[in-house]
A protein has these predicted regions:
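Carbohydrate-active catalytic/glycan-binding domains of CAZyme proteins
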Residues: 1-294
Length: 294
């Protein structure tokens, strides 16, 4: 895999344009193939904007399968921002959001919620169903929730769900059906979490760049270092904002190799460019401290 990364011409692997933005990547690595899921923001000929959860696959981060839409064309839902894909109870489960813009809003309105979508084979996906992240609180009373992410804690047999609400909110579950609310911490959107030697690193979107936190128990977190911005200062395509990091662990020569997928907007920031031009990039590290990019 290291040779694949070294042979990359650019870290900018999926490029947006005046009608398409590619945002919020989530990545599953299976049998030598990257399954890259992301938000497609598509501006139609009449200027109407629709959002989808989409997929492409690649073995070399250079040649990609055609982008496949996995969710419906409906601004009341705008299924998007896949957090990650986990395997549980015989099925692959993807957590994702609705980003409701049915009235022409720029950002998702208060109807936005978080969902799970299931697949037996990674080829076809069932209709998403909502996550009731606060126990018996009805869906209509949960408030705006976006950007979910799931991680399993083996020693306690507990699933941890992180999502954007009042900072980074946190719920837990034993079965991915019934959840208990655990509270929230300071932090941004697009959380991604990885287990490293029994500790946990959280990556989240700061105002610009990818913030890093550490925890030994998935409940108490502290900030680590400065936000990651990789080669942003030299990348016109990401000079406006670099964000939404998704971490994946591989192995290289028996040692960990971490890939960080993210999206960038530029040269203007997201106050100017939001529904167009955003693209997906990649950086990599052997220790989560020293990063490489092209």
């Amino acid at each position: 895999m290291l040779s694949v990364l070294e042979d990359l011409k650019s870290s900018h692997i999926i490029k947006g344009d005046e009608r398409h933005a590619f945002r919020d990547p989530a990545v599953l690595y299976k049998d030598g193939v990257f399954y890259i899921y992301f938000t497609l923001v598509e501006t139609e000929a009449d200027g109407t904007v629709y959002m989808y959860t989409t997929e492409t696959r690649t073995a070399d981060l250079t040649n990609f399968t055609p982008i496949k839409k996995l969710t419906v064309r409906d601004r009341r839902y705008n299924f998007s921002s896949p957090g990650n894909v986990v395997f549980h109870d015989g099925k692959y489960k993807m957590c994702l959001q609705t980003y409701c813009r049915e009235n022409g809003e720029k950002f998702g309105n208060d109807n936005s919620r978080i969902f799970i979508m299931e697949s037996a084979d990674l080829e076809s996906w069932d209709t998403p169903y909502p996550i009731l992240a606060k126990g018996d609180t009805p869906l209509s009373e949960l408030g705006r929730m976006i950007d979910p992410y799931l991680i399993y804690e083996e020693k306690t047999d507990v699933w941890h769900l992180f999502y954007k609400q009042n900072g980074v909110s946190h719920s837990t579950s034993h079965d991915l059906k019934h959840f208990n609310y655990e509270g929230f911490i300071d932090g941004g959107e697009n959380v991604s979490v990885i287990d490293v030697d029994g500790g946990y690193y959280m990556f989240h979107s700061s105002r610009n760049g990818i913030g890093v936190k550490f925890s030994s128990d998935l409940h108490n977190w502290r900030d680590v270092g400065e936000p990651l911005t990789f080669g942003q200062k030299d990348w016109p395509w990401a000079m406006g904002r670099l964000t939404a990091g998704a971490i994946v662990e591989l192995s290289e020569g028996g040692k960990p190799l971490y890939l960080m997928f993210f999206h960038g907007t530029g040269p203007e920031d997201e106050s100017v460019i939001f529904d167009t031009h955003a693209g997906i990039g990649v950086a990599w590290s052997f220790d989560l401290k020293n990063w490489f990019w092209k």
